[in-house]
């Protein structure tokens, strides 16, 4: 199987980051707004899941198998569909990617490429299982919010396109 997670992607470098620095970054990212400082402290304990990606790197590949999703802490990425003429979205700090494969256990549906140097927080299934239940639930709730917001956005786009065609 074509598995490309942070562990397998030799271009992404594991970041040697202090808990204080990681906490400072998490405090600036809206994905973690509903976490208490003590919960964020616990998350920074998973320091081996912080990665640095350089501009232009492919972070995940369409069709690959992986069990991780990523929260962008700094930088910007492009979401790319194989046959699309241009990127289908750009994501910024606080956004996440890879959540579809993480939740469904299916192959990656898009590729993701860094548009700038990025710091990413990787969450995989084993890591999620080792997190305290309240943190795990908040992460899952945040993923649900992300998916609902994206679905609402897609519904709006489909409605506007339908009106143009009619």
Question: Each predicted region: which residue ranges?
Answer:
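Cytosolic regulatory regions built on CNB/CRP/Popeye-like sensor folds
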Residues: 1-166
């Amino acid at each position: 199987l074509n598995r490309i997670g942070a562990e397998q992607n030799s271009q992404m470098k594991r970041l040697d980051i202090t808990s204080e620095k990681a906490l400072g970054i998490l405090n600036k990212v809206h994905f973690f707004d509903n976490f208490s400082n003590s919960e964020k402290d616990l998350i920074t304990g998973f320091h081996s899941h912080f990665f640095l990606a350089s501009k232009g790197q492919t972070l995940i590949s369409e069709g690959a198998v992986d069990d991780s999703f990523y929260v962008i802490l700094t930088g910007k990425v492009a979401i790319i569909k194989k046959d699309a003429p241009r990127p289908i979205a750009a994501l910024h700090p606080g956004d996440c990617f890879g959540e579809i494969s993480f939740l469904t256990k299916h192959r990656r549906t898009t590729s993701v490429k860094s548009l700038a140097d990025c710091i990413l927080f990787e969450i995989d299934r084993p890591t999620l299982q080792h997190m305290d239940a309240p943190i795990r639930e908040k992460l899952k709730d945040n993923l649900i919010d992300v998916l609902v917001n994206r679905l609402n956005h897609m519904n709006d786009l489909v409605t506007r396109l339908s009106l143009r065609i009619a």
